[in-house]
A protein has these predicted regions:
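Short loop/turn segments immediately following the C-termini of beta-strands
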Residues: 37, 47, 89, 120, ...
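Short loop/turn segments that connect beta-strands within the blades of beta-propeller domains
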Residues: 6, 28, 38, 80-81, ...
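Glycine- and Gly-Pro-enriched alpha-helical subdomains that act as flexible
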Residues: 24-56
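Structural signal for beta-propeller blades
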Residues: 1, 40-42, 92-93, 133-135
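Short loop/turn segments immediately following beta-strands, especially the blade-tip
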Residues: 45-53, 137-147
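Blade-edge beta-strand/turn elements of extracellular beta-propeller
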Residues: 2-19, 46-68, 94-107
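Beta-rich, blade/repeat-based domains predominating
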Residues: 1, 10-31, 62-89, 109-124, ...
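Flexible "stalk/tail and boundary" regions
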Residues: 3-6, 91-120, 125, 138-141
Length: 157
C-alpha cells in the first residue's frame, strides 16, 4: 500500500498483504479498508495525521465458495451508515461496523469486480460483473472520499 502526499512524495505504508486490491476510507475518514484478494480478509488501518497507517487488523472475514482458496475481493465502498460493501467471487458482501458480514448479494453471471454508489443522491448501487454493469436503487447512501467526513451512528449488536 502506497501513500502519496499532496506534493507527490511517495512511501510504502504496508507491504505485508498477499495482494492488496480494493481500498476505501470509512465515512468519517479515520480508517482505511483494504481488501486482500488472495486471502479471506478485509483489513482496517487507523489513518495517522502524517499519512502513515497504524493498528492494522483483520476486520472482516469474507466468505468464499467451497472451491476457492481466496475471496477474489476487489472493489470496496462504504455507505454513510458505516457498512462496507465488498466485491467478491460470491457477489457483494455487505459488512457491518462490528466486523460481521450481514448479507451476500449474489450476481447472475459470476464474480463482481467493482462497485460504486451513484445517482443524484448516491443511492443507486452500480456494480460490474463480467461484461455487464448492473444498477439497483438502495435504501442507503454511499459515502464519498471527496465529501466532508460523515460520522456514522453507533453500531448495533
Amino acid at each position: 500500500i502506497w501513500y502519496v502526499a499532496p506534493k507527490g512524495e511517495k512511501k510504502i505504508v504496508d507491504s505485508g498483504l498477499k495482494f492488496a486490491n480494493g481500498l476505501c476510507c470509512s465515512p468519517d475518514q479515520t480508517l482505511l479498508y483494504v481488501a486482500d484478494s488472495r486471502s479471506h480478509w478485509l483489513y482496517s488501518y487507523q489513518i495517522q495525521a502524517d499519512g502513515s497507517l497504524a493498528h492494522k487488523q483483520k476486520y472482516f472475514h469474507l466468505h468464499v465458495p467451497d472451491t476457492a482458496d481466496d475471496s477474489g475481493a476487489d472493489g470496496v465502498r462504504t455507505d454513510r451508515d458505516g457498512r462496507v460493501w465488498v466485491a467478491t467471487r460470491l457477489g457483494l458482501q455487505v459488512c457491518d461496523q462490528p466486523g460481521r458480514v450481514n448479507c451476500i448479494i449474489p450476481t447472475p453471471n459470476g464474480k463482481v469486480s467493482n462497485l460504486t454508489f451513484g445517482g443524484e443522491h448516491f443511492d443507486t448501487l452500480f456494480c460490474t460483473c463480467g461484461d455487464r454493469v448492473y444498477s439497483r436503487k438502495v435504501k442507503v447512501k454511499g459515502a464519498n472520499g471527496w465529501q466532508a467526513p460523515i460520522k456514522p451512528g453507533q453500531p448495533r449488536l
